[in-house]
Amino acid sequence: MNEKEIKQVFSDVQQRLDTLQGSDASFMFIGHQGNHFVISGKTNEISSQILFAMMRYPVIRDIIKECATRYDGLNAQYGSNVRNVKMDHLIEQNSGNEN
């Protein structure tokens, strides 16, 4: 995967999040270790919205999971608005709660 293709995946995810949460739901997928995913919103509130979107909408969770699988090794350090997300926990939270 080259940089252009990676940016396209991020753009696709961003568009879906914008549709779900409004234009302020900006995020960056930073990387993952095992099944822990690191995402960052512009603010803590937006990061929380992203986590909500991941739990509520399986398509968002699946896209972010795919990003993590395809782009292993992406890594960075950010401030307090970074969230570590354990995918097993999200799947467990979401199972049986689809309406």
Regions inferred by a protein language model and the residue ranges of each:
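Solvent-exposed interaction surfaces and binding hotspots enriched for charged
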Residues: M1-N99
